[in-house]
Amino acid sequence: MSECGGRGGGGGSSSSSDDAEDEGGGGGPAGSGSLSPAPAASSEGRLRRGLRGASLMARRRPELLCGAVALGCALLLALKFTCSRAKDVIIPAKPPVSFFSSRSPVLDLFQGQLDYAEHIRRDSEVVLLFFYAPWCGQSIAARAEIEQAASRLSDQVLFVAINCWWNQGKCRKQKHFFYFPVIYLYHRSFGPIEYKGPMSAVYIEKFVRRVMKPLLYIPSQSELLDFLSNYEPGVLGYFEFSGSPQPPGYLTFFTSALHSLKKDYLGTVRFGVITNKHLAKLVSLVHSGSVYLHRHFNTSLVFPREVINYTAENICKWALENRETLVRWLWPHGGKSLLLNNELKKGPALFVFIPFNPLAESHPLIDEITEVALEYNNCHGDQVVERLLQHLRRVDAPAFKSLAPDPPARLPDPPLITASPCCNTVVLPRWHSISRTHNVCELCVNQTAGGLRPSSVSMPQCSFFEMAAALDSFYLKEQTFYHVVSDSIECSNFLSFYSPFSYYTACCRTINRGVAGFIDSEQGVFETPPVAFSSLEKKCEVESPGSVPHIEENRYLFPELETSSSSFTGLSCRTNKTLNIYLLDSNLFWLYAERLGAPSAARVKEFATIVDVKEESHYILDPKQALMKFTLESFIQNFSVLYSPLKRHLIGSDSTQFTSQRLITEVTTDTFWEVVLQKQDVLLLYYAQWCGFCPALNHVFIQLARLLPSDTFTVARIDVSQNDLPWEFMVDRLPTVLFFPCNRKDLSVKYPEDLPITLPNLLRFILHHSDPASDPRNLAGPPTAECLQNEAVLQQGHIAHLEREIRKLRAEIGTLQRAQVQVEARLASARRDEHRLLRQQHTLERQHDLLRLHSEQLQALYEHKTRELDEVARKLQELADASETLLTENTWLKILVATMEQRLEGRDGADDRVPPSKARSEHPEPPGAPRLPASTPLPANISSTLASEGSPENRTD
C-alpha cells in the first residue's frame, strides 16, 4: 500500500506542478495585455492542454483508460456488424400453374417433370414435346396453335407441354434453351427433330404429318410424274416387298428421311418409295435397295453404294449436297437476320407472295410457278423436262420409255440453208447535226435448220423477243453503220450472242429527204417493201442524237400480240440478268410485300416483285394484273431484255400526312415533280432522320422561308431515307441543297459543299442563280442602259431590304443573347437550390435511418424483455404446482406414519387393541394439516406402499 501510495503522491506532485505550469502558461498571455492572440497558437495550446489532461487522467485512473479502450472496441464491433452489407433477400418463386386448360388435348407438365415425359415418350410412336416459359409472349401466342394442331392429331400423336422455366423442375436443370418456345418431335426412338418453322397450326400439323409419314408411296406413273414435277427435290428408293415384309435397306432409307427432316426443318427434300420394278426402270432403278436423286436440269444421280457406305446419315448427306433447288421458300423469323441479304447477293431475285395452305391437297398457283421456273431454266430442251411440263399442263402425251436423262448427243453442224427470215426497219440517227441524211437499215433474223427448236424454222414470222435480241445486238454495233455514205445497199452478217444457230443480217444505205423507198438487197436474201420516211425524219429531228426507236415499245401499243412460249423457254441462259425465284407465304409475311410496294388493302394477297441489289432497283408486277403463268412470263421477259421497258418502282411516304400550311413544303415521292416543276424558284433540302447535322439547319431554312415571298419562291425538303427519287435527282451526301430556277428547271444548281450553310450564304446563292439576266432567252442581244439602270435600282432595293432584315436579325440575336444570360443565371440559382435541397434531403434521410434503427432496437429490446417475463412467469407457475404437490404428499406421509405407529402398538398389545377410530382420536391430526374428503383417493405412490405392507408376504410372525 505504501508503494501504491508513493506512486500516487509522486503523481500528485508532478500533476500539481504541471497544472501550475499550465495555469501559468495560460495566464501569461492574458496578463500580458495582448488584445488579439493568434488563432493558430490558441488552437494548438488547447489541443496540447487536452492531450496533457487525458494523459494525467490516464495516470491517475488507469481503469478509466481500460474502460475507454474497451468501450471503443465495442463501438467498432457494433458499427461493423450494423453497417456491414446485409444478406440478399430472395423471394421464393410462386409455384407454377397449368399453362394449358384441363380440357386441352395437350398433356401439360407445368412443374417441369422431364423424367415423366421421357417415360411416356417410350410408349408412343410419335411424340411432340412443347417446351415453354410461362412468361414468354411467343409461348403464349403458340399455345393456341399447338392446341389446334393437337385437336386434329391427338388420336395419332401424343402432345406434351413442359414448363422449362420452373427452377425446381428437372427440365430447367437439364435443358439449357436460349429461346422459347422449342418444339421437339420423336418418332419412336429417333429424335429429337427440332421444328423451327412458323408457329402456325397448319405448318406444325404439316411437319408432324411428315414425321409420321416420312416416305411417300409411288404406285403409278401418274403419281411418279407428280412426284418428279414438284418444285422440291425428290429422292426415290426402290424396294421389293414380295420376298420379305422388310427388304434389306428399307429401314435405313426410312431413317434417312427422318434425318433429312432433322437437318432441314422445312422438309424441302421429299422421299418416296417405289415397289413396282417396271415403274422403277423409268428412273433407272433396277436393283432392290437402290436410291435415285431426281434433278431437273443437271444429271440425276443414283446413290453410289460401292463408294459410300449405305447408311442413313450418308444417304441424307448425299441428297442434301447434290440436290437441285428450282424454287425456294423463304421464312424470315422476324428478328435480325441475314437471310434476305444472303439471297439477294446471289443476283436478281423474283419474290412471289402467295397465300399458302400447307395442308391443301393441291396448289394450282404453285404448279403454274413451277411450270414457269421449269421453262425459264430449260436451256437445252430436255425431254424429261418437256414431259414434266406436259404433265403440269395436264396435257395427254405418250408415255416415255424412260424418264432418265439420255446422254448428251453431239449437235449436228448447222446447214447453210436458212429459213425465211423476219425483218424490221431501223432508222439510225444522223451522224452530224448539220447532216440532212440518215442511215436506214433493214435488220433480219436468220434461223438455221439445225436449231434447238425445229418448229420455229417453218414459222413465217419470228417472235417478238427474237427480234428484240437482234436489236440488242445491232445497237451494240450501230457505230459501224454511222459513216456509211453510199447509195447502194451494203449488208453484213453477225452472230447472235446467245444462240449458235442464229445470225443477223443488217443491210443499210444512206438516203436523203426525198427518198421514199428501199431497193432490193443485192444478195437476194430478203425483199423489203417501200417505206416512207418523212414521219421518221421529223421524229429524229426532234429527238436527241442518242435516241433510237426500239421494237419493244410496240408490245404495249398492241397488247393483243402474245409472245410464244418458245421465246421464254431457256431464257435464263440467254440473258445476263438470270433470276432466282423465291416464294413467301403472304398470310405470314405480307408486311414485307407492303414494304416492297404491294397495296396494304389488297383483296387477294398475291404479289410479285423483282429486286436487283446490284442495280439498286426493284420492279413490281402491276397489282391490277392477276398473278398467273402468263403475267409472270411477261414480267420476267420484260426484265430480261437489254432495254427493259419496266419502270423502277419508287417507294415514298404518304403525302396526306403533311399539311400544306407550312413555311417549308414537305416533299414525297408522289409530290416531287409537282413541287419541283412548278413555276417558282424552288430550294430543296435533302435530309434524313438519322442525319445528325440536318436538324441544325432547320432554323436557317425557316428564317429563309420567312424572308422570301411565298408566291414566287418555295423552300422545300425531302426525307431521302423514306422517299425514293429517280437516279438523276439522288445525292451522295447529306445535307444537300439543290436550287431549281423558275422556268429553267434544266439548269438546276447544287449548293457548294465547301461553303457553310448560313442564311447570308443561301441568300447570295439564290440571288446569284435566280437573276433573270442569266436566263438564256435574254442573251440574244446586249442589255440596254435603261434595263441595266432598272435592274440596278431593283437590286439596290433588294440589298436595302436584306440589310434591314439583317439588322433586325442582329437585334433579335442580341436580345436572345441577353435572355440567354438571364436564363443561365436563373438556371445556376435553380441548380444551387437543387443542391441545397438534395443535401437537406440526404440529412433527413440519414436522420430517418437513425430513427428507424433506434426504433428497431427498442422493438427488439421490448420483445426480449417480454420473452424473459414470460419465462419467469412460467417458472413461478411450475414452482407453485410443485409446492402444492409436495404439501399433499407430506400430508399423506404423516397419515401413513401414524397408521404404522398404530399397527406397531397393536402388535405389542394384542389383548388391548384399540379400534382405529379411538387411535385416531388419541392422535389427532396436526393443526393446519389438510383434510381429505372421504371420496378423495390416495395418491398412487402411497396406496401402492400400503398395499405392499398389507400383503401376506411382508407379514412376520
UniProtKB/Swiss-Prot annotation:
Localisation: Endoplasmic reticulum membrane
Positions with biased composition (Polar residues): 941-951
Record field: transmembrane: 64-84
Keyword terms: Coiled coil, Disulfide bond, Endoplasmic reticulum, Membrane, Redox-active center, Repeat, Transmembrane, Transmembrane helix
Residue stretches in coiled coil: 785-889
Primary site of residence: endoplasmic reticulum
Domain Thioredoxin residues, every copy: 91-213, 621-771
Stated name of the protein: Thioredoxin domain-containing protein 11
Disulfides per UniProt: 441-444, 691-694
Sequence ranges of Gly residues compositional bias: 1-13
CDD domains reported in the protein's UniProt record: PDI_a_EFP1_N, PDI_a_PDI_a'_C, PDI_b_family
Gene3D superfamilies per UniProt: Glutaredoxin
GO CC terms: endoplasmic reticulum membrane
Oligomer status and interactors: Interacts with the cytoplasmic part of DUOX1 and DUOX2. Interacts with TPO and CYBA.
Its job: May act as a redox regulator involved in DUOX proteins folding. The interaction with DUOX1 and DUOX2 suggest that it belongs to a multiprotein complex constituting the thyroid H(2)O(2) generating system. It is however not sufficient to assist DUOX1 and DUOX2 in H(2)O(2) generation.
SUPFAM superfamilies attached to this UniProt entry: Thioredoxin-like (SSF52833)
Family: Belongs to the protein disulfide isomerase family.
UniProt xrefs under Pfam families: Thioredoxin
Annotated region described as Disordered, given as residue ranges: 1-47, 904-957
Organism: Bos taurus (Bovine)
Top-level lineage group: Eukaryota
Membrane topology label: Single-pass membrane protein
InterPro entries: Thioredoxin-like_sf, Thioredoxin_dom-contain_11, Thioredoxin_domain
